[in-house]
């Protein structure tokens, strides 16, 4: 059997690939990519479990989530792993990209590796946005309303994108169905496709390692070889995965995932808050309102993402050592501080200002009873003064009904008989 498989499967080539040496100067930060992959698989496994009991309709979604949390064996634990695992994945992917920036690992010939990594970050954020609506509680509904409204501010295609996301004029059953399809079908296929391409480039070009403080050691130059990927790096990655899983399991056990009341589209007083990794965008809306709103909702995020994608082509400094790249160091530091600062401010800031309900005018405040009420006053032989109409309970009762012509005629006959 061994010879049969050996002749038909590239086991020798695969073994040689696993034993390919890594750079000599490597540390635990190089396990972040493996941890991100582990979290993606964990999200797929826990999501598949939750999908067995979930129903993507406004009538059943909230009840299904409640049933999972309260009735399904280990349901609350699995839901906790899925929920907190999503946050952990955002953190790990962000730290992984930050490590690549600090070590200059995006430089030639690894430009495509970087681009596919940034695209993966966008997909991870897409998972968070589409999955947020699925519980169909107040927080999920109104945060999605804000998110779709932000998308609608994009020039040219904004209204089209918002309409496609909603599936109509308002968020409802079609919206929930589309978000569920994106979250469970489209984005997973896209994510695993990008991961496959990203891993291919990582293994093809190898890791750049830690840049050394010598002008000769550039990312494009040959790197001093160290220990093989298997078993040394594999062992470190597995240990990191186990530690991460234990941490997530503890959080899932002791920190229940919140679930608010079922979504009420008429509750316009609700203060919508996105998930924490979107709070920096939420806070930007506080500084750019009215005609300037598009700067916070579209211009800054789009420009930032384009610059991130094109970073390998914009950074022409051949040196990889961080302190010899002052521009990259400054831009990275300012960006990280800005994102973290805006996130903290967004978590503690008051709700966005909304347009106040129209206040009564002088004309509406002094409006006299309708024609039917005036006729009723004559029939029942009473006359309310303007002050009584404005301030008494009798005036409120008068305004709370509308007499028909038959009722007025009947009341007149009663009055004449008396």
Q: What kind of region is each of these model predictions?
A:
Residues 291:
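Alpha/beta-hydrolase-fold serine-hydrolase catalytic core, especially in secreted/extracellular enzymes
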